[in-house]
């Protein structure tokens, strides 16, 4: 059966129902175009719903000059925040070589500038989104703290803070004692913190649900449990063959399927080299939990209050396309958090989760045009929620013929270090 999604003249077909695809659909509808979202699901494995729940403008890219000296440690130590278990994989080897090329001071500086500009666009739009969606979006502009226990962690945090100031983001520094005065949950071993004033926290699943609801209210269409198996271009536009046997068609198409974009990108004339980076979270019921979202500097763990529960999230595990929960990684996650929050030892575990983040070797997302009438938006790594509104703006501006900013050109398909 063929469904003519282009029956509405300016309707756009969006492959991918994570936060990036949803925000593109929302932006299209707000600017007078139509949108049909094809969402493969299921919800419970989506990194858009299981991430740390923090909007972190100016967050650094994964490749940095600090990574290469730790490379062997990352491969051999299962407790490393970025763990790369050795396995025979030519795509992984190529990715690692390209990743190593990205771990230079010059590329890090350029990436920080680009991610900072993109996240600034997003942050401004989150304020408007919070007003539009109301309490259902759970967007709380309460700031996010960066907390450390070691002198090395402090130096690392202060270097990133310098970058944030250059990019125009505000911060507030606290001693460990000041932090504990504000929030007694933190350990006596904590030496200090920086509060990122532009940070926000949220329940990412609730945000996705609120945006989905708004898409429907604006006249958009959302197909759930609808996996796209192939894409082709015909004389009348783009056609997506789905697992249900239906063919969805439209004059324009956006591929925003996260790590699953790899297999479809060639159909729109784009090559994207990504690796699935598995992340984990635990949901806890913890007495006297911290009240502000935080990133724990040394173990690279995110802590986010979500209603009566606390989300503990983190780790990057390059172990291929699978959703196997690795107990050792969960233990590492909780041990890292417990060093900062002693009360976690008596917390009740309510849920555990893992999902696959789409990570490029460059550390930058891929945002731009494919073959005529097609666009791609993927590779956001851990920053899908943070960068989604800005990504949607770049895609829709380009679709409507508005000039792209010079700094965003490095995000186009085919960019290399």
PLM regions: where:
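Active-site substrate-recognition segment that forms the wall
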Residues: 40, 51-55, 59, 63-102, ...
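Core beta-strand elements of the Rossmann-like FAD/NAD(P) dinucleotide-binding domain
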Residues: 8-10, 243-252
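Rossmann-like flavin
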Residues: 94-213
């Amino acid at each position: 059966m063929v469904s003519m999604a282009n029956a509405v003249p300016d309707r756009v077909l969006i492959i991918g129902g994570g936060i990036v695809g949803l925000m593109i659909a929302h932006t299209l509808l707000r600017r007078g175009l139509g949108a049909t979202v094809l969402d493969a699901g299921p919800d419970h494995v989506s990194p858009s719903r299981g991430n740390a729940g923090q909007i972190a403008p100016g967050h650094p890219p994964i490749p940095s000059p600090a990574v290469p000296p730790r490379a062997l440690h990352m491969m051999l130590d299962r407790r490393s925040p970025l763990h790369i278990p050795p396995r025979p994989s030519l795509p992984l080897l190529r990715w690692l070589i390209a990743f190593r090329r990205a771990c230079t001071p010059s590329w890090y500086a350029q990436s920080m500038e680009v991610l900072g500009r993109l996240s600034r666009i997003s942050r401004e739009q989150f304020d408007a989104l919070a007003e539009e969606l109301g309490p259902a979006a759970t967007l709380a502009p309460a700031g996010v703290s960066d907390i450390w226990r070691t002198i090395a962690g402090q130096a690392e945090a202060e270097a990133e803070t310098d970058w944030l100031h250059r990019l125009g983001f505000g911060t507030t520094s606290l001693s460990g004692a000041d932090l504990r005065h504000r929030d007694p949950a933190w350990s006596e071993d904590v030496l200090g913190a920086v509060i990122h004033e532009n940070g926000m926290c949220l329940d990412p699943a609730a945000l996705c649900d609120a945006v989905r609801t708004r898409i429907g209210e604006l006249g958009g269409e959302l197909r759930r449990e609808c996996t796209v198996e192939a894409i082709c271009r015909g004389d009348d536009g783009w056609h997506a063959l789905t697992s249900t046997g239906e063919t969805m068609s439209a004059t324009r198409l956006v591929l925003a399927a996260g790590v699953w974009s790899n297999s479809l990108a060639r159909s729109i004339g784009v090559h994207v080299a990504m690796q699935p980076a598995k992340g984990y979270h635990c949901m806890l019921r913890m007495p006297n939990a911290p009240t502000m979202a935080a990133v724990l500097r040394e173990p690279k763990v995110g802590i986010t209050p979500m209603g009566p529960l606390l989300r503990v999230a983190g780790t990057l595990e390059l172990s291929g396309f699978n959703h196997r929960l690795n107990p050792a990684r969960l233990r590492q996650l909780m041990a890292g958090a417990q060093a900062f929050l002693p009360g976690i030892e008596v917390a009740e575990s309510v849920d555990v989760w893992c999902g696959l983040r789409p990570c490029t070797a460059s550390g930058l997302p891929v945002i731009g045009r494919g073959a005529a009438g097609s666009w791609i938006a993927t590779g956001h790594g851990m920053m899908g929620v943070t960068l989604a509104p800005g990504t949607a703006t770049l895609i829709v501006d380009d679709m409507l013929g508005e000039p792209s900013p010079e700094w965003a050109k490095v995000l186009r398909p085919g960019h290399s270090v």
